[in-house]
Amino acid sequence: SDNGIARLKAENLWMSLSKRFNLPFQVFRLSGIYSNQFNILKRLKDGEAKIIKKKNHFFSRIHVEDIAEVLFESLKKFPEREIFNISDDRPASSEEVLLYGIELLKVKKPETIEIEDLESEMSKNFYKDSKKVSNKKMKDFFKINLKFPSYIEGLNYINNNSI
């Protein structure tokens, strides 16, 4: 996507600067971030969630507590110049995650919208490409066991502790 190309150019510029001035440099590419305060369960309860129909559209996500753990570990083990994908172990469609949230909360299914009917350009752009990435390098390098290896553990925790 255009946004992805722009991000890659920015990463390359920063990497060049770090080499030029001999500075350590790490890039953390964050997947879709969710937390106890910002998540599909809250959107379902607030009546803001909609099912967006798009076949084979997957993206990776990560709970904010797992992001914090990775960043903490990066302070202890700081490679000279590296790029890491920060994500959980299970890319999933937004529909799959939303349906799991419905099951947890035992609420009615929200309105379904076909991808062609989205009005927001930002939403259309989001659903243009799948965004699933591998977290293998992150897990191997930092020796991390994610607290929330998938949205299932994350949403269960949020449901039991936050809402």
Residues covered by each model-derived region:
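Conserved C-terminal active-site "lid" loop/helix of NAD(P)H-dependent oxidoreductases
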Residues: L99, L118-N145
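Glycine-rich "substrate-gating" loop/helix at the edge of Rossmann-like oxidoreductase active sites
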Residues: D2-G4, R29-I33, K54-V64
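Active-site Tyr-X1-5-Lys
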Residues: S1-Q26
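Mid/C-terminal beta-alpha module of Rossmann-like enzyme folds, strongest
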Residues: V70, S74-S123
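Glycine/proline-rich active-site loop of Rossmann-fold NAD(P)-dependent oxidoreductases
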Residues: L8, F21-L23, I33-G47, E65, ...
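Residue-level signal for the nucleotide or nucleotide-sugar donor/cofactor binding architecture
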Residues: I5, I62, A92, V133, ...
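A short C-terminal helix-loop "cap" of Rossmann-like NAD(P)-dependent dehydrogenase/epimerase domains
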Residues: L44-K54, L105-T112
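Amphipathic terminal alpha-helices
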Residues: P149-I163
